[in-house]
Amino acid sequence: IKIKTDGYIGYIVKKKFASKFKATHKVSVLKANTYKKPIIKTKQQKKLTFNSKILAKERNGLFIKFENCWIKTKDLKPINYKYKNIFSKIKIFKEVKYKWGGKSFNGLDCSALLQIFYNFNNRFCPRDTLEQRKFFKKKIKLKNINRNDLIFWKGHVAIALSKNTLVHAYGPLKKVVIMNIFKTIKRIENTAKLKVIGVRRI
């Protein structure tokens, strides 16, 4: 199979492969509970992560049915919904653990944090930092950094929340954190011996 959002090619057991469907909604919260019935007390262990896609089959009050489960309508957005500010909800991932290769509430890495918000807005973004740095072509100087700009190191990326703060899935702290931009640059230079190699405007 080929992953649409990444372009990666891999293999999956055929019987576990879902038939093609046209999604109608996507999860807009960090993790959404599912229910056996459209009743709160029937909550299941299964949860859906941010940007999971579903095909709605039925609506019942405050719930929508998909497959053999129900999910709260308030945890969903229509499939074509886009945030005006692409990273406006990025803080929902604050404190989520760092996990290399992860892309969910169970853990994610720095490049995934960037990619999933692009994917939520129905836009393509490469999976790896090297390709992301090439993909975003508008170069700016660090002194001109502002909200939503991207800061790249070798193998790492952070997203500016303002002129002074950034958010990133940071391996050494093992979680998604909000930090001062210039203290972070100094810290990474001192600990990992890495300098900023690019700043991009999306």
Model segments located where?
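Boundary regions of SH3-family modules and the immediately adjacent low-complexity/disordered segments
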Residues: K2-N33, K37-T42, S52-V96
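Helix N-cap / beta->alpha transition motif
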Residues: V13, K72-K74, D109, I178-K183
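Short, basic/aromatic beta-hairpin or loop at an interaction surface
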Residues: F21-K36, I116-R133
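Short alpha-helix capping/helix-loop boundary micro-motifs
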Residues: T34-Q44, R133-L142
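Loop/turn positions that initiate beta-strands
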Residues: L48-I54, I145-N148
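Active-site nucleophilic cysteine motif
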Residues: I90, G102-N121, C125-P126
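...with weaker cross-activation on analogous glycine-rich loops/strands in unrelated enzymes
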Residues: R123-F182
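Low-complexity, Gly/Ser/Thr/Pro-rich intrinsically disordered linker/tail segments
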Residues: E189-I202
